[in-house]
Every structure is written in structure tokens, then in C-alpha cells.
UniProtKB/Swiss-Prot annotation:
Gene: gatC
GO BP term, example: regulation of translational fidelity
Protein name (Swiss-Prot/TrEMBL): Aspartyl/glutamyl-tRNA(Asn/Gln) amidotransferase subunit C
PANTHER family: GLUTAMYL-TRNA(GLN) AMIDOTRANSFERASE SUBUNIT C, MITOCHONDRIAL (PTHR15004:SF0)
Domain of life assignment: Bacteria
Pfam families in the record: GatC (PF02686)
NCBIfam families: gatC
Amino acid sequence: MSQITEEQVKHVALLSKLEFSENEVKSFTDTFGKIIDMVEMLDEVDTDGVPFTMNVADNLNFMREDVAEKGLDREKLMAAVPEKEDGFIKVPAMLSDGGDA
């Protein structure tokens, strides 16, 4: 099995702004190791001569014409906003200062 360490899981959690209990760290360490083992097994499959496939489904993206349209009236929008600052909508902070991430 690939050697994924608990320190690596904790580092990824820090970068992702996630907090895990010690039991969760151990569980994720085991799970990530198994996932990497599976990917390594797939890497060993001989794909010589197999045509490149971007998508196995015949899904097509149908795009609409890009047309400029009048947006919301800024004054009406700002009148409905509970908190604003310097002409911008003020919302609660979602992330801290970033720390070591």
C-alpha cells in the first residue's frame, strides 16, 4: 500500500481549511492510501493502441448565443442590501487570514 502519512492528511486538511478528529485523520490516511493504490494499479494497465477518449458519453454542449443584456439596477440592489461599505456589499468573512495555508 502507498505510504500516505497522517502528517500529509493533516497538511491537506490545513490547506483545505478542514478540521478532522484523530480518528478521522487515521480513517482518511487509510482511505487515501487505498485510492492511490488503485490509481497506481490503473497506471500499470497497458493502453497501447487504445484510442484516446475524452468522454465515453455522447453528450454535447449546446451553447446559446452570448447576448449582452441589461443587468439589475445598482441603486435598487444596494437599497435592498442589509450592510454595505464603500459602495460594495459587505458579507461575513468566509476564510481567516490564511495562516500557513
